[in-house]
């Protein structure tokens, strides 16, 4: 009986040993693959974090460069503006711009005609309202009438306008030639008046002393 059970037991032992060795080989074959898979995932994460860090660094450098460029441009603009304000002679300007910004002189402004408004006034360029302040004319108000175009405006409105402009606010007629003519006529009139004053020669004869007059009367 012992001899009959021996082959079966040895075969079982052989089978178990074969199965164990097969399983162990399978496990040994699978473990390196798992280890390699874990090692393969680690470089991917490292590469991702490196790319994100590089992108953030590039973005930060771009922001710093843009801020620096903006600061430089602003400093240059402020410096050029301060230079223009401190040295207005160096600013190129045309005669037309200078005349527009300067306005007319007060002496020529006072020579422009002034009328008292009334509803019955018969002037073609005078309407019913002032185009500067957009208020209606009231009877008795003083209006200044511009030459050539004959447009009328409130005295205070047009005087303030003409201190900064050389044109009519309604038709944009230029008043440069007119004002120059007014000033030249005014200067000529002043010169004539001064010449007439200088040419007047007043001679007053001296009076005789009272004592001589009394003596002459007594003797006569």
Swiss-Prot record:
Q: Which InterPro entries match?
A: ATL10/ATL72-79-like, Znf_RING, Znf_RING/FYVE/PHD
| UniProt-listed Gene3D superfamilies | Zinc/RING finger domain, C3HC4 (zinc finger)
Quote the catalytic activity from the record: S-ubiquitinyl-[E2 ubiquitin-conjugating enzyme]-L-cysteine + [acceptor protein]-L-lysine = [E2 ubiquitin-conjugating enzyme]-L-cysteine + N(6)-ubiquitinyl-[acceptor protein]-L-lysine
Q: Answer yes or no on keyword Transmembrane helix.
A: yes
Q: Which GO terms describe its biological process?
A: protein ubiquitination
**Membrane-protein topology:** Single-pass membrane protein
By what name is this protein known?
RING-H2 finger protein ATL77
Question: What is the species of this protein?
Answer: Arabidopsis thaliana (Mouse-ear cress)
């Amino acid at each position: 009986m012992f001899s009959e059970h021996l082959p079966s037991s040895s075969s079982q032992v052989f089978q178990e040993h074969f199965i164990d060795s097969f399983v162990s080989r399978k496990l040994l074959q699978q473990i390196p693959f798992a280890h390699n898979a874990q090692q393969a995932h680690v470089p991917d994460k490292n590469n991702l974090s490196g790319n994100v860090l590089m992108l953030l660094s590039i973005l930060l450098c771009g922001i710093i460069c843009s801020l620096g460029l903006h600061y430089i441009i602003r400093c240059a603009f402020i410096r050029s503006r301060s230079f223009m304000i401190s040295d207005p002679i160096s600013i190129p300007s045309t005669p037309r711009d200078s005349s527009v910004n300067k306005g007319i002189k007060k002496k020529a402004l006072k020579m422009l005609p002034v009328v008292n408004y009334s509803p019955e006034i018969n002037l073609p360029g005078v309407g019913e309202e002032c185009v500067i302040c957009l208020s209606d004319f009231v009877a008795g108000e003083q209006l200044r009438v511009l030459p050539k175009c004959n447009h009328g405006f409130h005295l205070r409105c047009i005087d303030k306008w003409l201190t900064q402009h050389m044109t009519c606010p309604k038709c944009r007629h230029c008043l440069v030639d007119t004002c120059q003519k007014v000033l030249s006529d005014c200067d000529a009139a002043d010169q004539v008046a001064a010449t007439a004053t200088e040419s007047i020669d007043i001679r007053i004869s001296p009076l005789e002393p009272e004592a001589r007059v009394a003596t002459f009367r007594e003797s006569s």
